[in-house]
UniProtKB/Swiss-Prot annotation:
GO molecular function, one term: DNA binding
Effect listed in the UniProt record for changing residue 474 to R: In a colorectal cancer sample; somatic mutation
CDD domains (alphabetical): KRAB_A-box (cd07765)
Name of this chain's protein: Zinc finger protein 155
PROSITE patterns attached to this UniProt entry: KRAB, ZINC_FINGER_C2H2_1, ZINC_FINGER_C2H2_2
Function: May be involved in transcriptional regulation.
Organism: Homo sapiens
Family label: Belongs to the krueppel C2H2-type zinc-finger protein family.
Presence of keyword Nucleus: yes
Family matches, as Pfam families: KRAB, zf-C2H2
């Protein structure tokens, strides 16, 4: 027979109010509250649970989950015990049989009539015993015996196997449908709770952060965020979780189980919600929209992180350098800068990366793939972000403005680099010579001087270059492309820098002079390059 490792107690499903909270409820809310509690009671009783356990009675007494006030009470004959009236439940005679369903209906009827009754008695049911009026009828369910008048059954309801209960208890459940979304729900009390989602009603507020919830169970789960409590532990690795559902999802990591498969691409997922979110990538659906800028997102978490950009909120702070971040994942990636950890490594060249996205972007360098094409000029790009930045060149949009000088830029990274020219900040230092640079890109170019790396190769002559701009200028020598023209002598030039030097060339201040056209250059290098052009022309 199947056994359960952890029995569900009445405390697990109880909706708990303090005395102060009960005073804030109006009559309609009190009625809803009573219905929820009675429904929970009924569910536990229907599966053979013993609701009047000693711990349960202590819980009911301490938490005072019923309204204070007008309970009809009387003192018993022994020790001044106080009992709540259950007048409608008669004592079972020797020839009377009472089912659990009948007992439940009688209890519910009485509790409904006196909904303001309190179950906070100091000795509600001594030693966890069920009142004889209620328990007398139970033997016919699990033993078939008929006790004598006033007799007690020695076996508690919790001892009754679930399979021995009458099957009619399960077939009598009704299905209720939500008018708003069409969802089917088994119990009317659960339907009332569900409808709070549509009306936006949130009765339960966190005392720490003020966040509101529609159900007390959600509030209790949320409060573990503040307390740090993680009662659900993984048996495999010992990791703790604040919710049982999170533990169940985590366990699939150990088993490797991924039961939810995408029909479009075949990708498998651990949780059905992950599959549902993934499908939006194929459909293009972005249901989460920012109210401020109108940007849409596939996932609610992305929208939440994006909203912090507008509010300026950066709740995640680095303990090492005090830098703040919008997202915890961004903080985790940043911490790797201090530790030097690079978990993503390229198998082709061995280069390591901190972030998964940077790793994926790098792999495109080896494949040479450029899937993003500009419709204006046909230019191809490896990444969508590069295409987006490029398209601003055609539109002329420069949405990133410098507050110091008013200069506009196509990208935020360009603005950030420019702002360092005002502050004089050069955060990127060369470990070899200590020279500082405004951008990491310039530092990477400089380091090739020390390493001797020249990754750009000319296929025409086999010459190697350390910079992409250098090989681009070099290729013009082979194709005789000279896009720049000297305004003084009309000579076509390969490099834009030659034309910029012209105003000084004819001032007489530059010592290097060309004997063919008479131009002077500030640097001998520029003259040598120009002479090579004359030789190529001849």
């Amino acid at each position: 027979m199947t056994t359960f490792k952890e029995a569900v107690t009445f405390k697990d499903v109880a909706v708990v109010f303090t005395e102060e909270e009960l005073g804030l409820l109006d009559p309609a809310q009190r009625k809803l509250y009573r219905d929820v509690m009675l429904e929970n009671f009924r569910n536990l009783l229907s599966v053979g649970h013993q609701p009047f356990h000693q711990d349960t009675c202590h819980f009911l007494r301490e938490e005072k989950f019923w309204m204070m006030g007008t309970a009809t009470q009387r003192e018993g004959n022994s020790g001044g015990k106080i009992q709540t009236e259950l007048e409608s439940v008669p004592e079972a005679g020797a020839h009377e049989e009472w089912s659990c369903q009948q007992i439940w209906e009688q209890i519910a009827k009485d509790l409904t009539r006196s909904q303001d009754s309190i179950i906070n008695n100091s000795q509600f049911f001594e030693n966890g015993d069920v009142p004889s009026q209620v328990e007398a009828g139970l033997p016919t369910i699990h033993t078939g015996q008929k006790p004598s008048q006033g007799g007690k059954c020695k076996q508690s309801i919790s001892d009754v196997p679930i399979f021995d209960l009458p099957q009619q208890l399960y077939s009598e459940e009704k299905s209720y449908t939500c008018d708003e979304c069409g969802k089917s729900i088994c119990y009317i009390s659960a339907l009332h709770v569900h409808q709070r989602v549509h009306v936006g009603e949130k009765l339960f507020m966190c005392d720490v952060c003020g966040k509101e919830f529609s159900q007390s169970s959600h509030l209790q789960t949320h409060q573990r965020v503040h307390t740090g409590e993680k009662p659900f532990k993984c048996e495999q690795c010992g990791k703790g979780f604040s919710r049982r559902s999170a533990l169940n999802v985590h366990r699939k990591l150990h088993t490797g189980e991924k039961p939810y498969i995408c029909e479009a691409c075949g990708k498998a997922f651990i949780h059905d919600s992950q599959l549902k979110e993934h499908k939006r990538i194929h459909t293009g659906e972005k249901p989460f929209k920012c109210d401020i800028c109108g940007k849409t997102f596939y996932f609610r978490s992305r929208l939440k992180s994006h909203s912090m950009v507008h509010t300026g909120e950066k709740p995640f702070r680095c303990d090492t350098c005090d830098k703040s971040f919008h997202q915890r994942s961004a903080l985790n990636r940043h911490c790797m800068v201090h530790t030097g950890e690079k978990p993503y490594r390229c198998e082709q060249c061995g280069k390591g990366f901190i972030g998964r996205l940077d790793f994926y972007k790098h792999q495109v360098v080896h494949t040479g793939e450029k899937p993003y094409n500009c419709k204006e000029c046909g230019k191809s790009f490896r990444w969508s972000s590069c295409l987006l930045n490029h398209q601003r060149v055609h539109s002329g949009e420069k949405s990133f403005k410098c507050e110091e000088c008013g200069k506009g830029f196509y990208t935020n990274s360009q603005l950030s680099s420019h702002q360092r020219s005002h502050s004089g900040e050069k955060p990127y230092k060369c470990e070899e010579c200590g020279k500082g640079y405004v951008t990491k890109f310039n530092l990477d170019l400089h380091q090739r001087v020390h390493t001797g790396e020249r990754p750009y190769n000319c296929k025409e002559c086999g010459k190697n270059f350390s910079r992409a701009s250098s090989i681009l200028n070099h290729k013009r020598l082979h194709c005789q492309k000279k896009p720049f023209k000297c305004e003084d002598c009309g000579k076509r030039l390969v490099h834009r820098t030659y034309r910029k030097d012209q105003p000084r060339d004819y001032s007489g201040e530059n010592p290097s002079k060309c004997e063919d056209c008479g131009r002077r250059y500030k640097r001998r290098l520029n003259l040598d390059i120009l002479l090579s052009l004359f030789l190529n022309d001849t």
